[in-house]
Amino acid sequence: MNILIIGATSGIGYGLWQHYSTSGNRVAVMGRRKAELDVMARTAPDHTVASVCDIADTGSFDVAFDHIVGELGTLDLVIVCAGIGELNPELNIVTELTTVGVNVTGWTNCIDRVYRQFSEQGRGHLVTVTSVGGLQPTPVAPSYSASKAYQINYTKSLQAKSKGTGIFVTEIRPGLVDTRMAKGEGLFWVMPLDKVTRAIIRAIDRKRPRLIVTRRWRVLNYLLKHFM
């Protein structure tokens, strides 16, 4: 397969690159950290195409995306992991607007460009990584929880839009994962990255429309959705 992972230099995206780049696929990776991307390209040179890109810069993303399509020809699977999350109890406006710029504006441009590419191809599998945090207001990170609620509903809209086409859309909705984005002391139910990555790979292989990972977070997801 020809695969693109957006937000691949750490966390879930990096774990997915490790799997797919060692499974006979050609994997394009995008991220902000050039040093990490260079290491990835050197580690699996025959299976990795790297492109430095910050999705908040929509023009830069469009150029990088067109370059990737030119390199790979077609895209079979695109996984969008890019995003930021900062604790912001003081409501620092720079933090709030930066979060919106990445998780809403940049993310939407990214998703839209991928979906249009799949429409041109007549097929493709889009995977978004949202968060259980999008189901409940978060006083210490209001912009983050609001942005994840946006992503959840945008993904649902694309799932409805893609019915009857060759495009399939999967939403991955994790709880707290042991990555750079999990911030704070004594975090509740933090999940090991390798366990989460394996579950995501299975869901993608089976083309599940949605995965709430792991099981304990599925219970919390149900409670938040129906009783909060």
List where the protein language model places each region.
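C-terminal helical subdomain
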Residues: E171, K183-Y222
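Conserved NAD(P)H cofactor-binding loop of Rossmann-fold oxidoreductase domains
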Residues: C81-L87
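Residue(s) in the substrate-gating loop at a strand-loop-helix junction
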Residues: S131
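Short alpha-helical oligomerization interface
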Residues: N88-G101
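Conserved glycine-rich cofactor-binding loop
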Residues: T9-S10
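Conserved glycine-rich Rossmann-like NAD(P)H-binding loop of the short-chain dehydrogenase/reductase
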Residues: N25-M40
